[in-house]
Amino acid sequence: PRLDYGKQMLVYENLDAPTGPSLVRYILGHIEQSYMSHALTIHASRFYTAIYPQKYRQMVLENKPVFNTTPVDYSPHKPLRIAYLGNIRYIDILKNLADAVRGDERFKLSYHGGGPDYEDLKDYVNGVPNIFMTGPYKYEEIEHLYGSADIIWAAYPNKDFNVRYAISNKFHESLAYAIPAVYADKTRLGEYVVASSLGCQVNPYSVEDIRSLLIELYSNRERLLQIHESLKRQYREENS
């Protein structure tokens, strides 16, 4: 749809939902709605439409990377290979993941990427024989990194209002390469992947919950293979 006001058109690109304390969200929400009443709003997540009045003109245009690939060959390994790719931040959650597998020979955990908390995390896992930090990578390497993993860690802090409704690039990458990923519970994305057999969800603040899920996936190879097949099928449907 196109909105023309004389010779002007206002397009509001909504990349993130307002977040912060409730008063801040209230103020930002009113500012947003003043824009939306005179604009076409383009949402970067399919889940944002649920938090905005339907009377406004809206469309979804997710920030999907362009993939020239086919799903990688997939066969879960022992030890189970878990990978995090991206900016090293949300350090408490990344430490929880490390604690969930620390010293457990059933798992191999790799953190790929740099960022503000890189040195902190590096010190935290220093000397742990089954945890590795590889540092920054180029995006051209991402297919190889996905192909070297059995599970992708994509659980962000669900206490953040935006995270509850956002859809991450990790979802689109997981779909393209057909590698199962773990997302935060109490989020629309987490609910969606579980309902569609496209991934798993977990409480990212609980080491015990993370450990329990990973042990279940280690013991239940068929669940991972089922998710892999669902991801391939979904990707074909979206790109046919």
What is each stretch, according to the model?
Residues 4-8, 12-41:
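Membrane-proximal helix-turn-helix segments that form the acceptor-binding/catalytic region
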Residues 17-19, 47-48, 60-71, 88-89, ...:
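Short beta-strand->alpha-helix junction loop in the catalytic core
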Residues 42, 65, 73-92, 97-101, ...:
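Conserved donor-binding/catalytic core segment of Leloir-type glycosyltransferases
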Residues 92, 140-145, 152-172, 176, ...:
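Nucleotide-sugar-dependent
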Residues 119-148:
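Nucleotide-activated donor-binding/catalytic signature segment of Leloir-type glycosyltransferases, i.e.
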Residues 205-208, 219-240:
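A charged, aromatic-enriched C-terminal amphipathic alpha-helix characteristic of glycosyltransferases
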